[in-house]
């Protein structure tokens, strides 16, 4: 999965492993990053980086040892360019002990940022109806893919065919588990830069314009539902 970096420091690109950024840089993550009391390190694994780095923290760019390419194991290059197919990990290191909980709030415009920085990919629609599955509300269908495709967050995706949901994708291990909300009427649009070269898990996050959020990777009790939404509970 490409780790797209924006608004860190243009002069620092291409990023090198172990590159450090001081506290205060304006960077993004598609989900909240939490420092618990006493915690000195936090990692961010997905498309963008970290917003509002706390005073006294440093950001370290590192490579991931197990990438979803071929057999799943590949060392990353010494230099990482924006748009490369390497997933980077941003490590937030707290230089001193914490005396309070710190939450780095996520950036919600991930789709638009990806659209601005991604090239040579295409949009793929995956409506539920194409799977041929007999799925009832509350069931946990397993969607598996073994095809090679990429897709991009197109600039017009936010209004695509009247669908008011924004869907983000993260790549995990071997399958995607989802619970279908019976009120959902639109297509589920998966967005990724990663070629699916083997059975991989789709980890989906859906945000509605009205503000409701559906998060993959949470238990059904933690899924927030809203009218016309799709709740997913991706397995780990």
Swiss-Prot record:
Biased composition range(s): Gly residues: 226-236
Signal sequence extent: none
Top-level division of the source organism's lineage: Viruses
Spans annotated as Disordered: 217-236
Protein name: Uncharacterized protein ORF75
Top-level taxonomy: Viruses, Duplodnaviria, Heunggongvirae, Peploviricota, Herviviricetes
């Amino acid at each position: 999965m490409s780790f797209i970096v924006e608004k860190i420091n243009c002069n620092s690109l291409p990023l090198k492993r172990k590159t450090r950024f001081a506290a205060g840089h304006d960077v993004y993550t598609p989900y909240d990053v939490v420092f618990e009391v006493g915690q000195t390190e936090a990692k961010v694994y997905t498309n963008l980086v970290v917003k509002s780095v706390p005073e006294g923290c440093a950001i370290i760019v590192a490579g991931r040892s197990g990438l979803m390419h071929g057999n799943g194991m590949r060392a990353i290059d010494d230099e990482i360019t924006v748009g490369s197919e390497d997933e980077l990990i941003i490590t937030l290191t707290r230089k001193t002990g914490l005396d309070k909980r710190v939450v780095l709030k996520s950036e919600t415009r991930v789709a638009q940022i990806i659209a601005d920085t991604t090239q040579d990919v295409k949009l793929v629609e995956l409506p539920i109806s194409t799977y041929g599955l007999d799925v009832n509300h509350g069931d946990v269908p397993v969607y598996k893919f073994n095809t090679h495709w990429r897709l991009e967050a197109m600039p017009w995706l936010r209004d695509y065919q009247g669908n008011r949901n924004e869907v983000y994708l993260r790549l995990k291990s071997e399958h995607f588990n989802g619970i279908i909300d019976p009120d959902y009427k639109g297509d589920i649009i998966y967005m990724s830069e990663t070629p699916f070269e083997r059975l991989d898990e789709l980890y989906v996050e859906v945000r509605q314009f009205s503000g409701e959020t559906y998060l993959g990777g949470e238990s059904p009790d933690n899924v927030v539902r809203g009218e016309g939404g799709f709740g997913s509970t991706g397995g780990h």
